[in-house]
Structures are given as structure tokens and as C-alpha cells.
Design a protein with these regions (language model features):
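Bacterial N-terminal signal peptides that target proteins for export
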Residues: 1-9
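Alpha-helical transmembrane segments
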Residues: 12-16
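C-terminal motif of bacterial Sec signal peptides marking the signal peptidase cleavage site
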Residues: 18-21
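Bacterial signal peptide processing site
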Residues: 23-25
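Post-signal peptide N-terminal segment of mature Sec-exported envelope proteins
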Residues: 30-52
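Exported/periplasmic cell-wall-interacting domains
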Residues: 46, 59, 132-223
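Gly/Pro-biased beta-strand-loop elements
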Residues: 49-166
Length: 223
């Protein structure tokens, strides 16, 4: 009888110890999962939006200094951010997911399937805004000429011809992503919103290279 009771006691003790061990492992996993991740340390696939949904967001709807709005496009994060001066501070106003060139790196020539990069010291500018609702393009994929630019085409003044910010008719499933021939694509709804609320001829546009670190004002306004 004593031997049976002793065996039962040992079994209960072992089971209790095992349950405590599992609970401890589960608790550690939860703590690890909740740890904040630095976007600069994320694998490129995550940082570029391949594994996360992204939608347009407006962060500030108040008044900002006239003529102070500018754009920063991140090749790494696949986002177009609108900034402006509010009470003396550079403030994040809005954000849109984008589709950029199929290939990474600095654009060197027409047709190389790369989006050009620039710096804050030498930004690109919006040189004209055109109604592109009837424009077609043949991507060479067998579909022939198709509507491909959305409602608006915002032409950029760059060292290369034909680069602009436009809609994404028929390809919005690749947003955000890397599929353009060099232009910056927004969804059709987003290009309309961006044009109506922020874009204007002469607006500065900075397109950051994949390895370009965040500017101080970007770090201060991470959302």
C-alpha cells in the first residue's frame, strides 16, 4: 500500500513539474513576441511590405505652412510619406503604400527597370500634373495596350525621362510591391486623394535608395 502511494506521489510531482515547465516556456514566448522590432533591423522582405498589409493613412488634417509640404518615398519600406511644417516642426501628414521598380538600385538608363533615387539636398520636383485616365501602355506581357496610369500622372523632373507618380489600374494586387518599370505607382483611389489634397507643381520629392537611413525628422515621426 505504501509502495503504491509512493508511486502515485512521484507521478503527481512529475506531472506538476512538467506543467510548470510548459507554462514557463509559454510565458517566455509571449514576452518575446511582444518585443518591439526595429524596422531598420528587419529582413528586407518584411521591411519592403511583402509580409504585411499596408493602407493609406492620414495622420494630420489641420493647417500647415503653405508651400511647406514635400514627399519622401522609401524604396525600402515601399511607402510615400507626405511631410509639412506645423508650428515649426516637420510633421508626417499622410502615408500611401507604393509599387516601385522591379529591380533595386539607382536608375542608370532608360529601360533598366529601376526607380531613380535622390537626396534631400538635390530632390526631384513635380513638373506637371496630367489627366491620365485615357493613357494606355503595353507591358509586353501579352495583354496589349491597357489603361495603366489611373486618373493622374504627376511627372517628375529627374535625369531620366518618363518617370512619374501615377495610379495602378489593373495591378493593385501588387500594392505594396516591386513591379513597375521605374515609376511610382499608387492605387487609383490614392493617386486621386494625393493629387486633390497635397500634390502641386514644384513640390519636392525625395526618393530614398534602399540603403539610405532615416532622416532625423522621419525618426521623430515614426507611426
Amino acid at each position: 500500500m505504501k509502495r503504491g502511494f509512493l508511486s502515485f506521489s512521484i507521478m503527481v510531482f512529475a506531472l506538476t513539474l512538467a506543467m510548470s515547465s510548459c507554462k514557463g516556456e509559454s510565458g517566455n514566448a509571449s514576452a518575446a513576441d511582444s518585443t518591439a522590432v526595429n524596422p531598420d533591423e528587419q529582413p528586407a522582405e518584411i521591411a519592403e511590405g511583402k509580409f504585411r498589409p499596408d493602407t493609406a493613412k492620414v495622420f494630420f488634417e489641420g493647417a500647415y505652412d503653405a508651400g511647406s509640404a514635400f514627399v519622401v518615398i522609401s524604396k525600402r519600406e515601399l511607402r510615400l510619406n507626405v511631410y509639412a511644417t506645423v508650428n515649426g516642426d516637420t510633421t508626417l501628414i499622410a502615408r500611401y503604400p507604393v509599387c516601385l521598380s522591379r529591380l533595386k538600385g539607382q536608375k542608370e538608363k532608360e529601360g533598366d527597370m529601376k526607380t531613380p533615387s535622390c537626396t534631400m539636398d538635390e530632390p526631384f520636383t513635380i513638373s506637371e500634373i496630367k489627366d491620365a485616365s485615357t493613357w494606355v501602355h503595353d507591358f509586353g506581357d501579352g495583354r496589349g495596350p491597357i489603361l495603366a496610369y489611373g486618373k493622374w500622372f504627376l511627372r517628375l523632373e529627374t535625369p531620366h525621362k518618363g518617370i512619374g507618380i501615377h495610379g495602378n489600374t489593373g495591378n493593385e494586387d501588387k500594392m505594396p510591391g516591386r513591379d513597375s518599370e521605374g515609376c511610382i505607382r499608387l492605387s487609383d483611389a490614392d493617386i486621386i486623394h494625393f493629387k486633390e489634397h497635397y500634390a502641386e507643381v514644384g513640390m519636392k520629392v525625395v526618393i530614398k535608395d534602399e540603403n539610405e537611413p532615416r532622416y532625423p525628422f522621419e525618426t521623430n515621426s515614426i507611426r
